[in-house]
């Protein structure tokens, strides 16, 4: 099981930039403060709405039932929490956790406007230091969040700690396309079109430039699978979606 200590005074990546690890969380949070109000709209525009299909597939693979306790980690504006709240019912609970208070407030407002009031709770916290006891959750899900974490392995260890035996982890994020042609087209779209959309819609091209770069710095499908295995998870598998542009990793804690 992973027990590596976090080293201080090290360098990590923020997109394609090298930055001291201690400021990455601040830089990432600043990005999401800037894009928060246009986040849902930009997701629909950038992915042509396909992100909703990817998230629905995550829900279908989650095996969440009535009465379950679910952690929507880095849950942002709450797309997964909306769906999980229906699955867990009145006897269950969903924790929508995000490190960014602006995103969290928008998520809370969105869910309340939908009438989701009782079985979703909201917590601002860092994924590397989850404020929960061991063996708390039946399911932990992360949707397009892991690539923004400073210490991915530490976060995965924390997830392992708070999952109950038999609990399931699901990680949905952008990944590596499976064909060279798709990679070329995807790169052209990502680097030349997405920042322009961000400038027009959100008046912020730099934040979307970072988001594009962060995708390229994220571990590929096999690397992430091995990272998850190294923590102690079992039955790790992944599903490529839209030619590998996104991938869903699933694993269990036994």
UniProtKB/Swiss-Prot annotation:
Reaction catalysis annotation: a 2-demethylmenaquinol + S-adenosyl-L-methionine = a menaquinol + S-adenosyl-L-homocysteine + H(+); a 2-methoxy-6-(all-trans-polyprenyl)benzene-1,4-diol + S-adenosyl-L-methionine = a 5-methoxy-2-methyl-3-(all-trans-polyprenyl)benzene-1,4-diol + S-adenosyl-L-homocysteine + H(+)
Q: Which residues bind S-adenosyl-L-methionine?
A: 77, 98, 126-127, 143
Q: What is its EC number?
A: 2.1.1.163, 2.1.1.201
**Pfam families assigned:** Ubie_methyltran (PF01209)
Q: Which GO terms describe its biological process?
A: aerobic respiration; menaquinone biosynthetic process; methylation
User: A Gene Ontology molecular-function term?
Assistant: demethylmenaquinone methyltransferase activity
Q: In which pathway does this enzyme or protein participate? A: Quinol/quinone metabolism; menaquinone biosynthesis; menaquinol from 1,4-dihydroxy-2-naphthoate: step 2/2; Cofactor biosynthesis; ubiquinone biosynthesis
From what superkingdom does this record's organism come? Bacteria
Q: Which UniProt keywords apply?
A: Menaquinone biosynthesis, Methyltransferase, S-adenosyl-L-methionine, Transferase, Ubiquinone biosynthesis
InterPro entries associated with the record? SAM-dependent_MTases_sf (IPR029063), UbiE/COQ5_MeTrFase (IPR004033), UbiE/COQ5_MeTrFase_CS (IPR023576)
Homology family: Belongs to the class I-like SAM-binding methyltransferase superfamily. MenG/UbiE family.
Which HAMAP family does its entry note? MenG_UbiE_methyltr (MF_01813)
What does the UniProt function comment say about this protein?
Answer: Methyltransferase required for the conversion of demethylmenaquinol (DMKH2) to menaquinol (MKH2) and the conversion of 2-polyprenyl-6-methoxy-1,4-benzoquinol (DDMQH2) to 2-polyprenyl-3-methyl-6-methoxy-1,4-benzoquinol (DMQH2).
* The name this protein goes by in its record: Ubiquinone/menaquinone biosynthesis C-methyltransferase UbiE
């Amino acid at each position: 099981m992973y027990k590596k200590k976090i080293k201080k005074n090290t360098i990590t990546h923020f997109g394609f930039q090298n930055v001291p690890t201690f400021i990455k969380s601040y830089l990432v949070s600043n990005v999401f403060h800037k894009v928060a109000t246009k986040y849902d709209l930009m997701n629909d525009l950038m992915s042509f709405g396909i992100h909703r299909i990817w998230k629905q597939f995550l829900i279908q693979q989650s095996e969440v039932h009535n009465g379950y306790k679910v952690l929507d980690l880095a849950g942002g504006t709450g797309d997964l929490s909306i769906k999980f709240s229906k699955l867990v019912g009145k006897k269950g609970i969903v924790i929508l956790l995000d490190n960014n208070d602006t995103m969290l407030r928008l998520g809370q407002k969105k869910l309340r406007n939908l009438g989701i009031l009782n079985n979703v709770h909201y917590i601002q916290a860092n994924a590397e230091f989850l404020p929960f006891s061991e063996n708390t959750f039946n399911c932990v899900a992360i949707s397009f969040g892991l690539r923004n974490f400073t210490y991915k392995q530490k976060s995965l260890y924390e997830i392992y700690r708070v999952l109950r035996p038999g609990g399931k982890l699901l990680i949905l994020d952008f990944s590596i396309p499976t064909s060279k042609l798709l990679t070329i087209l995807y790169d052209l779209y990502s680097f030349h079109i997405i920042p322009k959309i961000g400038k027009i819609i959100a008046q912020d091209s730099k934040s979307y430039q970072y988001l594009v770069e962060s995708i390229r710095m994220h571990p590929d499908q096999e690397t992430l699978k091995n990272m998850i295995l190294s923590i102690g998870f079992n039955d790790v598998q992944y599903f490529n979606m839209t030619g590998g542009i996104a991938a869903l990793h699933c694993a269990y804690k036994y």
